[in-house]
């Protein structure tokens, strides 16, 4: 192990290398701490919303202790829903940074409520939150470049290259240097991530997959750095070329691909669905009540044999046209979700060629912060909203009195964290690309000449 101590001394003797490694360790630690702090803040928000909503419901119960048909309690009572962060969410914020993880809904039309909490600010969403995924995808390659760009040119400029190449087993020397430097970068990423995973209660399989993705991503960039560093250029030229490659692969090409996807697979924002549903609801006031009820009962025959509408206002008509408003945009909602999933599928395919995109998609999947996780939360909200509607419809359409005791019978939402293992194809593609580029770089390094 003397060679290891010797190579470590060489690295630590270089103030630039030592400072770079310490900086990466610090940045990763801050990113992990920031992610843990954010997920804890979200859990505290979720813990507060239930007692606050219970107090709100108690206020409604005092205001409407009894109702002849449950209309007023149905209209004024809110129900909290929440999407708790997974144990791995501290690693990658993903869509949790722009999509609500807490949403209160009523028995009224769902679509108008589902998207009114949507946040869309492209200037803020572009860079993303400073988390482990950000450090790995955008910053870690820069440290690989800093440690490997002068691997050969530095020895040439110092006049030692000819001597090193003349040594027996010289190829092993270069491989050891590359491996040690990459291992140190990996350690600066892995150590804070492991500590954060233990603090967050993350399972071992998920952590192992995250570390594998990090290792493969670093291997890709090590291969790229070697392909450039072995071309015989000066250190400055190597660094400039590698910085250009980094900008193209991590910033330019993903941005251009995103613009292309936006044009090829156009998808409206969720707020457009909200506006369409609200227009349908507002227009229902101009439609004869009997016509509205006929249309509603045709789609919900289980309420067909209930009492007819009285001549005065009745809440069941009001809730009926809210439900019809949701149904009027059902095709648009389906097209919206299908469009989002098509974009997601193309993004995953793009990750087969751009390792940064592929690694980020895998991390978001493990963390449960990607698009499928957000849509799964919306599905849970929709299923719960149907339970709430069905609960109140029993009072509204049967003219059954709603008393103080009935407030305790209300449905209760059960939140659960999202998160799943990524597809085998995504991990395999990243592995194949990383190992291919690394093998090409090591091959050139093994054929190094003065």
Ranges and model annotations:
Residues 127-154, 158:
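Long, hydrophobic alpha-helical segments
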Residues 149-153, 196, 200, 225, ...:
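Membrane-water interface at transmembrane helix exits
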